[in-house]
Swiss-Prot record:
The lineage of its organism: Eukaryota, Viridiplantae, Streptophyta, Embryophyta, Tracheophyta. A motif (SPL) lies at residues 44-52. Residues 14-26, 86-101 have a biased composition (Low complexity). The keyword NAD does not apply. It comes from Arabidopsis thaliana (Mouse-ear cress). This is Protein SPEAR3. InterPro entries: SPEAR. It is found in: Nucleus. Keywords: Nucleus, Repressor, Transcription, Transcription regulation.
Length: 193
């Protein structure tokens, strides 16, 4: 059907202006359809493959934290929401949070710098970082930049030992061993992805 446009230069206009307008407008229309519409579609959001990666990574993070039997699952879900700075994160991906570089609009959560100071308990966790505890990096989607960013926080199981002074001498070694084992498992799973 596109070739019929080029075959009829005198379509309802004068002979001097019709060939120019009819030959330039189909070319212009073709560029608009193929050139500007197609690149805009991927820029609107994440692709299916990227969303699947994020979902799988979220399930992986959720499963790796739930291997600790001493941390009750219901309190873990509440604690992750506090750390993420987003009060109603769905349970399918609790380790992800939305962050924005502008003042926080309602659907996106808090500014990344403010997320660590969400409440007093969270502030204590971030300031008590001993040399033996390793920070955990959880990726989060930043809608203003269109990329994945990382935020640092210490694993809840590791900091629990440091917050209770009476248990510090008893469980310091076992807590670090548990963390190192989970770190080795995490590296193995990342290599498979």
């Amino acid at each position: 059907m596109g070739s019929s446009f080029f075959g009829r230069p005198k379509m309802g206009g004068s002979s001097s202006s019709s060939p120019t307008s009819s030959s330039s407008s189909p070319a212009k229309r073709g560029k608009n359809k193929n050139g500007s519409d197609k690149p805009k579609q991927p820029q609107r959001g994440l692709g299916v493959a990227q969303l699947e990666k994020i979902r799988l990574h979220g399930e992986y993070n959720c499963n790796s934290f739930n291997t600790y039997p001493s941390y009750h699952p219901s309190t873990y879900q509440e604690d992750v929401r506090i750390q993420g700075g987003y009060p109603s994160i769905p349970s399918s991906s609790p380790s992800f949070s939305y962050a924005s570089s502008s003042p926080p609009p309602a659907p996106y959560g808090f500014h990344p710098n403010m997320m660590m100071n969400a409440n007093n308990d969270q502030y204590e966790r971030t300031t008590i970082r001993y040399g033996d505890s390793q920070p955990h990096r959880a990726p989060s989607w930043n809608p203003s930049y269109g990329i994945l960013e990382s935020q640092h926080f210490v694993e809840p199981n590791t900091t629990r030992h440091f917050l209770h002074e009476d248990q510090r001498n008893i469980s310091l070694g076992s807590g670090i061993q548990n963390f190192e084992t989970s770190e080795a498992n995490e590296l193995d799973l990342e290599l498979r992805l």
